[in-house]
């Protein structure tokens, strides 16, 4: 077992020196079976604030297709507390403009094989033609596939 210390807003975090208040110790297993964990597709995009509702409608449409093709879960998060960093940050990563918000999203799949099959179907689906009316600049989207190595609580 490992014991880690978690923090929530208030006292300074040792690594980033941001302010954190409460610290709590959590015990987790020493080994975690990565093979039994899901596969994640992660995305970060800049969306014009004026397009927020259009983005939500767009996401609901396309996220339902991901689920239809095997995704376990899809999460879309509109930036709320996205600070500027000293070296880099989410806004710089997607070249967000003043009138844009950063959206952080992920698609969770049972495993990489399910993801590969689901994404292949997704890209071939005729409903993808509607993506041409995307409410954000897709050229600035960053994305990637990730193997889950820690998932709590499980």
Could you describe each region identified by the protein language model?
Residues 40-47, 86-122:
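Short, well-ordered beta-strand segments in beta-rich or mixed alpha/beta enzyme
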Residues 54-67, 102-107:
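Generic detector of contiguous secondary-structure segments
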Residues 1-11, 26-32:
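Ser/Thr-rich, low-complexity intrinsically disordered segments
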Residues 22-35, 67, 71-98, 124-154:
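Glycine-rich beta-strand-turn "strand-cap" elements at beta-sheet edges
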Residues 57-62, 118-125:
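Short amphipathic alpha-helices in soluble, non-transmembrane regions
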Residues 33-61:
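Long, hydrophobic N-terminal alpha-helical segment
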Residues 13-16:
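Cysteine-centered motifs
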